[in-house]
A protein has these predicted regions:
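N-terminal Sec-pathway targeting helices
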Residues: 2-14
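Hydrophobic membrane-insertion alpha-helices, especially the h-region
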Residues: 11-24
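Ser/Thr/Pro/Gly-rich low-complexity linker/stalk segments immediately outside membranes or between
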Residues: 28-41
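Electrostatic cytochrome c docking/interface patches
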Residues: 42-72
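Surface-exposed intrinsically disordered loops and tails
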Residues: 45, 87-122, 161-178, 222-226
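Sequence/structural segment immediately N-terminal to covalent heme-attachment motifs in c-type
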Residues: 60-100
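Sec-exported extracytoplasmic/periplasmic mature domains
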Residues: 69-76, 82, 154-158, 205-212
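Electron-transfer interface patches adjacent to heme c in soluble/periplasmic c-type cytochromes
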Residues: 75, 96-152, 160-161, 189-200
Length: 227
């Protein structure tokens, strides 16, 4: 092969490589654009479906919108973290009655749903969903920091230690073995623990933007100091 032929061959190889690289970069950019488009779509939809006024002061707007989408369109957090089916929806807004859906803002994520004695009938504690709204500090879920909130979703730890493991016969306040009283029961944290940090942060940001619900008087675990 002559030097001229070698040069032409090398040039052809370089051109093919350049085309391949350009194609790869274009594919990556398209994927990034598609993902950004999906993210923006979720953010917009999140604001559209938020059932309560949002306080965006000092908040990351994009995270609040994404958090609303996750909480209201994917996770159905209010389905458990409201006082129950009877008060989850506003009058005339129960979709199960064939009515246009309207969430009750007075109970939205304020907790209070009683799942009954756990693990079943007997002298066992009632599992009641927690109040997820922010308190007077502006921090959601009883004033927990983001790191604490993330730890709850990742590990299921019950930072309030409401129902410890029984050290003797069940008395209605403790959980019988083999249930671990350090962990939240019923809450599907084993599923939530697989969420990305970005999504968990978005949920936290959204919960910090919703109105505070005071709930029943202290010392109820559902009580929030709103002012």
């Amino acid at each position: 092969m002559s030097p001229k032929q070698v040069f032409k061959s090398a040039g052809a190889v370089a051109m093919v490589a350049a085309i391949a690289i350009a194609g790869t970069l274009l594919s990556v950019r398209r994927l990034q654009a598609d993902e950004e488009g999906r993210e923006q779509s979720r953010i917009r939809r999140g604001f559209e479906i938020a059932p309560v006024p949002l306080n965006l002061a000092g908040k990351n707007r994009a995270l609040v919108g994404l958090g609303s989408y996750i909480v209201n369109a994917q996770a159905d957090c209010d389905g458990c973290h409201s006082a129950g089916p009877q008060s989850e929806f506003a009058p005339g807004g129960n979709p199960y009655f064939g009515q246009p859906t309207k969430v009750n803002p007075d109970t939205y994520l304020g907790g209070g749903r009683d799942f009954g004695p756990f693990p079943g009938p007997g002298p066992f504690p009632h599992i009641i969903s927690r109040n997820l709204t922010p308190d007077k500090t502006g921090l959601p879920e009883g004033g927990h920091t983001y790191e604490e909130f993330k730890q709850i979703l990742r590990t299921g730890i019950d930072m309030d230690h409401i129902h410890p493991t029984c050290s003797g016969p069940p008395d209605g306040t403790c959980l019988p073995a083999p249930f671990d009283g350090n962990l939240l029961q019923i809450m599907p944290w084993p599923i939530h623990q697989n969420m990305t940090d970005h999504d968990i942060r978005a949920i936290y940001e959204y919960l910090s933007a919703i109105p505070c619900i005071e709930g029943p008087p202290a010392p109820s675990i559902l009580h929030n100091d709103c002012n």
